[in-house]
């Protein structure tokens, strides 16, 4: 019994370093928020201006990798011996469900305002040209390109799971073909895993930092409770306690039901916005934006604004590419898990078609609604952001719809459930990654899951205390830097191993 308990406990070499590093960074930040903001601005400026080009080339190279997988020698290789675990419809629906987080609702509702007010290509702010390129850039940042770049990692993890039968819970496990077992399981592998975990902790804390103000602003609208940092902290604490109760009482089935409710409610809310906001305008704007995307795609791919130095590609494209990089391993593991039995080509096409449809629907419907409210002078978004913050501006885009109280209740429930499932997924992923001998289908220790959910909650509160979007963007970019190299190593490891076990015919 004692030995069994030891085997299922924490793995010190990947548990304590991330805990200590993140704890120290949080303590230093809280101790002097002004100094922390100065450092944050410096880090953001350095990474985006000096190394932004690397993120752009990474995405382009990975895009070519997608074409190689779809039309190359491994296109018809099957990921596992069994038939597909899920029907195609269920498979696509699960992909859509993975895109309906509160952070996505945050960006989908407000992103277009930033593109119109500070547009790329030296366009005049608020001009027709800025509005025409606004949604096109959202479709670029959340469209086929980033989903195609996930294909290599998704195929790689599916290959290691179902073809090589490896028990992969940390990225170092996949690096054996590339660096050898000694290094993959030694100091090098430990460093890789710690980079991954620190970046993942900050990414999850960032998502929580985006989601929480939406819920508290909904509470202010519905119940008249003033939105303060203290209320944000109380709400995050309630989520952590609720997550602990669910885990302790074996209510994971309830969390699964909540996740399904989130998906169906997302469909309902998006359908409602589409109908009442202006279906004809939305479809026309979307069609026009696809044309703009195709026309400007080459420049968007390589746009660094080296001469004009307007800062648009650094503030948005590089930031979003870092966002995609930092979530790549976690998302690819999920996509691989649900793709057992499918061919490489099926997985690559399914990701690009299914996931692009999901994100394009979200950004088109929500972004078009925001633009309409601005054009009709129903909302003064710059004033709302200046006086009350970004979250209030987002809430007002929903409150401006017909039957505002019912609409706000729907949005409140959607954001609340999305964040509960986010914290549950965060604590589970981090606990699985920092414990030893926790097999697929088993549960990691309760206290470890609760501990990680607390730490993620603390990061969310710290980011909220710093204020504004820049700390959140910097946390993503800083975390994306080490994972940039980790993702490349996992990809190269797959290619090297597949040459041996998937010999060309």
Swiss-Prot record:
HAMAP family: CaiT. Keywords: Antiport, Cell inner membrane, Cell membrane, Membrane, Transmembrane, Transmembrane helix, Transport. Pfam families: BCCT (PF02028). GO terms for cellular component: plasma membrane. The gene is caiT. GO terms for molecular function: (R)-carnitine:4-(trimethylammonio)butanoate antiporter activity. Its main location: membrane. One of its GO terms (biological process) is carnitine metabolic process. This is L-carnitine/gamma-butyrobetaine antiporter. Homotrimer. It is found in: Cell inner membrane. It comes from Citrobacter koseri (strain ATCC BAA-895 / CDC 4225-83 / SGSC4696). It is a multi-pass membrane protein. Catalyzes the exchange of L-carnitine for gamma-butyrobetaine. The chain crosses the membrane at residues 10-30, 50-70, 92-112, 143-163, 195-215, 231-251, 263-283, 316-336, 347-367, 403-423, 446-466, 475-495. Belongs to the BCCT transporter (TC 2.A.15) family. CaiT subfamily. It catalyses: 4-(trimethylamino)butanoate(in) + (R)-carnitine(out) = 4-(trimethylamino)butanoate(out) + (R)-carnitine(in). Pathway: Amine and polyamine metabolism; carnitine metabolism.
């Amino acid at each position: 019994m004692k030995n069994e308990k030891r085997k299922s406990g924490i793995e010190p070499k990947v548990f304590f370093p991330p805990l200590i590093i993140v704890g120290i960074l949080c303590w230093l930040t809280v101790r002097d928020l002004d100094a922390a903001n100065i450092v944050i601005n410096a880090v953001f400026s350095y990474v985006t201006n000096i190394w932004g080009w690397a993120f752009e080339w990474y995405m382009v190279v990975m895009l070519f990798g997608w074409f190689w997988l779809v039309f190359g020698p491994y296109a018809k290789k099957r990921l596992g011996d069994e038939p597909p675990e899920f029907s195609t419809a269920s498979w696509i629906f699960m992909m859509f469900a993975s895109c309906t987080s509160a952070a996505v609702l945050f960006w989908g509702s407000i992103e277009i305002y930033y593109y119109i007010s500070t547009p790329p290509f030296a366009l005049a702010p608020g001009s027709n040209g800025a509005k025409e390129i606004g949604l096109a850039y959202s479709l670029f940042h959340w469209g086929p390109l980033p989903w195609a770049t996930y294909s290599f990692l998704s195929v790689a993890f599916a290959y290691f799971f179902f073809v090589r039968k490896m028990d992969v819970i940390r990225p170092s496990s996949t690096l054996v073909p590339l660096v050898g077992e000694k290094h993959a399981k030694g100091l090098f592998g430990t460093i890789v895993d710690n980079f991954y975990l620190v970046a993942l902790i900050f990414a999850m804390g960032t998502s929580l930092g985006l989601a929480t103000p939406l819920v508290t602003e909904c509470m202010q609208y519905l119940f008249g409770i003033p939105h303060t940092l203290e209320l944000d902290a109380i709400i995050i604490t309630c989520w952590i306690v609720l997550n602990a109760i669910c885990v302790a009482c074996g209510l994971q089935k309830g969390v699964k039901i909540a996740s399904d409710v989130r998906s169906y409610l997302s469909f309902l809310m998006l359908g409602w916005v589409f109908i009442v906001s202006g279906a004809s305008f939305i479809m026309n704007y979307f069609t026009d934006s696809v044309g703009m995307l195709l026309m400007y795609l080459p420049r968007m791919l390589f746009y660094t604004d080296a001469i004009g130095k307007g800062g648009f590609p650094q503030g948005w494209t590089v930031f979003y590419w870092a966002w995609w990089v930092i979530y790549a391993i976690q998302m690819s593991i999920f996509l691989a898990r649900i793709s057992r039995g499918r061919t490489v080509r099926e997985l690559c096409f399914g990701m690009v078609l299914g996931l692009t449809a999901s994100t394009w629907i979200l950004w088109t419907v929500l972004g078009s609604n925001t633009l309409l409210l601005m054009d009709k002078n129903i909302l003064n978004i710059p004033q709302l952001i200046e006086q009350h913050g970004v979250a209030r501006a987002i809430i007002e885009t929903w409150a401006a719809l017909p039957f505002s109280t019912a609409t706000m209740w729907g949005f409140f429930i959607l954001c609340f459930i999305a964040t509960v499932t986010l914290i549950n997924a965060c604590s589970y992923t981090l606990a699985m990654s920092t414990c030893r001998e926790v097999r697929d289908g088993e549960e990691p220790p309760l206290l470890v899951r609760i501990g990680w959910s607390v730490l993620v909650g603390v990061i969310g509160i710290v980011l909220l205390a710093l204020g504004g979007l820049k700390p959140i963007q910097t946390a993503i970019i800083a975390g994306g830097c080490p994972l940039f190299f980790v993702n490349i190593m996992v990809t190269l490891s797959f290619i090297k191993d597949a040459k041996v076990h998937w010999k060309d015919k």
